């Protein structure tokens, strides 16, 4: 698949999963979020990734949220399904369940907690890719998984036909260059770090899977639209205004701050998260509110 494939480029939202005060998924609110991002010009949505609280939803809930997101989108925006797990068999089960869901592809995280070797990581993703025809996007986020997938392993996996790209969330932009060199120019690289996302585009990334996008969707869509055509002056102007927000949305564990911010802006009805995640600490809330004001969102 070409690196210019519009399904996997530009401003991609790591979508929150809205919940009510009882911890149940709020599908009415989810539908409104999908509409909001379509109207704002977002290029794609990731349903039930890390920001969507995949770890505290059952497989059945994961699949239902993804299917409803596809239903609400009505073909107007590509939906990428979070389908990772730290057990290869579970990731395969999830991927198979999504076969006829209408998703554009799957985002699959490096196995967390059990810390596989590079060979184990390779075999994990190879087994998942072999169970489906859906395009697969690898997801490397060692700060959360405890394992770092090396560029050399990515290059091996890039030889598998339906492994088409990676969400690289180390925040080390030199990785973008290294992966492009080893995996080839047609292998899609998406930044997973808002603070360095624009720099990643300058170094050859095709887009960004963004947390900030949840609450600054139009600004983010505009910024990456400018960046991808080389108008970095306009892109930098937007990015400077959002930089405090990029950082403060991680002042506590994601998605705690972004859910509170989305609630503060009226995008969702509740900032509720499922345990063990709890809502944003009261003493931290003014800092995030200040970041929203600096960004021009309040």
UniProtKB/Swiss-Prot annotation:
One of its GO terms (molecular function) is 4-hydroxy-tetrahydrodipicolinate synthase activity. Pathway: Amino-acid biosynthesis; L-lysine biosynthesis via DAP pathway; (S)-tetrahydrodipicolinate from L-aspartate: step 3/4. This is 4-hydroxy-tetrahydrodipicolinate synthase. Catalyzes the condensation of (S)-aspartate-beta-semialdehyde [(S)-ASA] and pyruvate to 4-hydroxy-tetrahydrodipicolinate (HTPA). The active site is at 139 (proton donor/acceptor), 167 (schiff-base intermediate with substrate). Gene3D superfamilies: Aldolase class I. It catalyses: L-aspartate 4-semialdehyde + pyruvate = (2S,4S)-4-hydroxy-2,3,4,5-tetrahydrodipicolinate + H2O + H(+). InterPro entries: Aldolase_TIM, DapA, DapA-like, Schiff_base-form_aldolases_AS, Schiff_base-form_aldolases_CS. GO terms for biological process: diaminopimelate biosynthetic process; lysine biosynthetic process via diaminopimelate. HAMAP family: DapA (MF_00418). It is found in: Cytoplasm. Keywords: Amino-acid biosynthesis, Cytoplasm, Diaminopimelate biosynthesis, Lyase, Lysine biosynthesis, Schiff base. Homotetramer; dimer of dimers. GO terms for cellular component: cytosol. The record marks 50, 113 as: Part of a proton relay during catalysis. It is an enzyme of class 4 (lyase). Belongs to the DapA family. The keyword tRNA processing does not apply. Its main location: cytoplasm. It comes from the Bacteria. Its EC number is 4.3.3.7. Pyruvate binds at residues 51, 209.
């Amino acid at each position: 698949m070409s690196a210019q494939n519009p399904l996997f480029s530009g401003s991609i939202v790591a979508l929150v999963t809205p919940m009510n005060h009882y911890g149940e998924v709020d599908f009415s609110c989810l539908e409104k979020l999908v509409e909001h991002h379509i109207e704002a010009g977002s290029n794609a949505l990731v349903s039930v990734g890390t920001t969507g609280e995949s770890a505290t939803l059952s497989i059945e809930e994961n699949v239902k949220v993804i299917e409803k997101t596809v239903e609400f989108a009505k073909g107007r925006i590509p939906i990428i399904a979070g389908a990772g797990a730290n057990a290869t068999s579970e990731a395969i089960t999830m991927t198979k369940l999504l076969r006829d869901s209408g998703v554009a592809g799957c985002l699959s995280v490096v196995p967390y907690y059990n810390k596989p070797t590079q060979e184990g990581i390779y075999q994990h993703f190879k087994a998942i890719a072999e169970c489906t025809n859906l395009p697969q996007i690898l997801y490397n986020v060692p700060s959360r998984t405890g394992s770092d997938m090396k560029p050399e392993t990515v290059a091996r996996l890039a030889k598998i036909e339906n492994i088409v790209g990676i969400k690289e969330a180390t925040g080390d932009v030199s990785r973008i260059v290294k992966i492009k060199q080893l995996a080839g120019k047609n292998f899609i690289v998406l930044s997973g770090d808002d603070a360095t996302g624009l720099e990643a585009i300058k170094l050859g990334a095709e887009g960004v899977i963004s947390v900030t996008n949840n609450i600054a969707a139009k600004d983010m869509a505009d910024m990456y639209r400018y960046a991808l055509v080389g108008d970095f002056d306009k892109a930098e102007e937007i990015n400077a205004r959002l930089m405090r927000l990029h950082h403060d949305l991680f002042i506590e564990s994601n998605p705690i701050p972004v859910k509170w911010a989305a609630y503060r802006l009226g995008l969702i009805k509740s900032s509720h998260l499922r345990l063990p995640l709890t809502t944003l600490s009261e003493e931290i809330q003014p800092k995030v509110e200040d970041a929203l004001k600096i960004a021009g969102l309040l």
